[in-house]
């Protein structure tokens, strides 16, 4: 089965075609992504109106390019899939309406995909990973620990009770006068810094619950920077290194407890695995810390290629293909959802968490 996927949930416009065979193995035929960093950089963050307009301007030609790169015509794909949420509502509307129109014109089945499910299933595309496994999703809009039991069967073990990790990176960068996007900027500066200079907090470390918290760490960074004004270059690099070390320790504590819980629930699992996805998963220091953690616990550490960790349409096409193998198509009447939890059975987190894109 060949599926055309479309992703427009935030500030990347993307189209891709993925093939899934009868054995459940996947192959990416094309994967086109257009970033909007240049459009949003002057504002220090994503502006929803600008993002939606940029999607409108770019999406048609990206779909054409994805088809051309795959050597296919629209009528030769077997289904169309698009992100229906969560995300910025303007961008979701652009992608969803385009995908519906293409599906209707070509008389192909349509699948509305949860963006988080795309991240959750990427390791099955890249590594053929069997169920069950653990997913750590770390991005600008999410920080979640998820147990993936099967297609559509997800249990949220932990989530952020305030800021997403990617947002904490971006806010730290902004406090220190670093360029947008903040995550890569903080990582670059941290390489030159002393991570032991500042004793920043490790929120919720040692607690039994598996939730995350980063607002206190962000506040500590602000207080530290304020006390040092005017900041020297060495101050900035040391704050970045100390911040990144605190994040690595916090993730290791939360994830370590999740690995122990997984082994208790699935003692006979032959291939216990931790998958890390989302834009923050591109951070090499955090990857190394989590990989070492997995080695100590006897887990395989799986991080998709960097271009598949950040937002892309290949993961959306693949999620559509996985669902198409066992589920009926979605109605063309389906509406976009700016908020759409992957695990709809778990109690929602009220009054906390990111209030913005893909919250």
Curated annotation (Swiss-Prot):
Q: Domain of life, per the record?
A: Bacteria
According to its UniProt entry, the protein's GO biological process terms are: tRNA threonylcarbamoyladenosine modification
Q: What role is this protein assigned?
A: Required for the formation of a threonylcarbamoyl group on adenosine at position 37 (t(6)A37) in tRNAs that read codons beginning with adenine. Is involved in the transfer of the threonylcarbamoyl moiety of threonylcarbamoyl-AMP (TC-AMP) to the N6 group of A37, together with TsaE and TsaB. TsaD likely plays a direct catalytic role in this reaction.
Which CDD domains does the entry mention? Answer: ASKHA_NBD_TsaD_bac
User: What family name appears in the similarity comment?
Assistant: Belongs to the KAE1 / TsaD family.
Cofactor(s) for this UniProt protein: Fe(2+)
Question: Gene of origin?
Answer: tsaD
What keywords tag this UniProt record?
Acyltransferase, Cytoplasm, Iron, Metal-binding, Transferase, tRNA processing
Give binding positions for substrate: 137-141, 170, 183, 283
Q: Which reaction does it catalyse?
A: L-threonylcarbamoyladenylate + adenosine(37) in tRNA = N(6)-L-threonylcarbamoyladenosine(37) in tRNA + AMP + H(+)
Where is it localised?
A: Cytoplasm
Q: What is this protein called?
A: tRNA N6-adenosine threonylcarbamoyltransferase
The UniProt annotation puts the region (Disordered) at 328-359
Determine if Protease is one of this entry's keywords: no
Give the molecular function GO annotations.
iron ion binding; N(6)-L-threonylcarbamoyladenine synthase activity
Give the residues the record marks as binding Fe cation.
115, 119, 311
Q: What's noted on cofactor binding? A: Binds 1 Fe(2+) ion per subunit.
Under the heading Pfam families, the entry gives:
TsaD (PF00814)
The UniProt record lists the EC number as 2.3.1.234
- Record GO cellular component, one term: cytoplasm
Question: PANTHER family, alphabetically?
Answer: TRNA N6-ADENOSINE THREONYLCARBAMOYLTRANSFERASE, TRNA N6-ADENOSINE THREONYLCARBAMOYLTRANSFERASE, MITOCHONDRIAL
